[in-house]
Curated annotation (Swiss-Prot):
Organism encoding this protein: Saccharomyces cerevisiae (strain ATCC 204508 / S288c)
Role played: Glucanases possibly play a role in cell expansion during growth, in cell-cell fusion during mating, and in spore release during sporulation.
Localization of this protein: Secreted, Cell wall
Record-given protein name: Probable family 17 glucosidase SCW10
Entry-linked Pfam families: Glyco_hydro_17
Gene: SCW10
Lineage per the UniProt record: Eukaryota, Fungi, Dikarya, Ascomycota, Saccharomycotina
Amino acid sequence: MRFSNFLTVSALLTGALGAPAVRHKHEKRDVVTATVHAQVTVVVSGNSGETIVPVNENAVVATTSSTAVASQATTSTLEPTTSANVVTSQQQTSTLQSSEAASTVGSSTSSSPSSSSSTSSSASSSASSSISASGAKGITYSPYNDDGSCKSTAQVASDLEQLTGFDNIRLYGVDCSQVENVLQAKTSSQKLFLGIYYVDKIQDAVDTIKSAVESYGSWDDITTVSVGNELVNGGSATTTQVGEYVSTAKSALTSAGYTGSVVSVDTFIAVINNPDLCNYSDYMAVNAHAYFDENTAAQDAGPWVLEQIERVYTACGGKKDVVITETGWPSKGDTYGEAVPSKANQEAAISSIKSSCGSSAYLFTAFNDLWKDDGQYGVEKYWGILSSD
């Protein structure tokens, strides 16, 4: 599908992240935007018929920051080639930091199954969800019970039975024996997007992945391996460090026998503000959640996500494909401007995303993550598209 879009320039205001006490948390940052337009064209895969339409595009310029990493954006901004129509309206958005969580901090290879009495985050299943798997590139999945403990092999298998319609499944780490459990439970045609979450344990993670692949599948089952999640957006790494992490992982993965794509995952804003990130990944893998733009209603989530794809594509000079590695809508939580959490709105948002750019997007997430804190706006637990509430 071919689209025309407008490049916009805006301002980023980041807030400090609280240090996690036991496990990694999902945190948000506020983003204030002011828009300037410039015409560009980009090709994006969607599920509607081929159409040429104008859409708005935001390129973000960081002006203040609570971290040294984020402040780098002031020297790596995206300049439009043409300026026109200055838009004076502002919008508040924030980004969702999604991460690996386990019952033991720092363990990238935990394999302890949870007890049968542990409550599973998939307890509320797809029975009452009308969202289908068709139309999306894939879905994200985390193997944790409501108390944060690891799901058993049997629990993971039960979860995966509900995900058979998705072509690709994204995992965030290697803890809880998740790679081997998902490899055993997935269908023969499904592919995995794996994650190396702990960048100080890259070789350990690669060893775990290699062992699982050799025991329960082949490297053909793996479509992508990511290194870290939102490191620049979270202020925990510079762009140069991200490049080093990706290089280290590529070398280790190549030695292990893997020849597929290796990427770093960050927010769309982090990439726009730090286009050096475009140099390291085999394609651009970014997270984008329309709920955190207070001016975007659920039914408009798809065009909003498409704009973020085009923004990143432009920031990278049109040289890298863009895949949305997280996008969705919460079913519970606080109303944030036009963004209203509810199951009906979640279904409307997912439908809109699929229609606009579904073949370029991983839906977030399979089941509610009740092991998380409520977080800002009280939405952190309730993104499960196959959960009943």
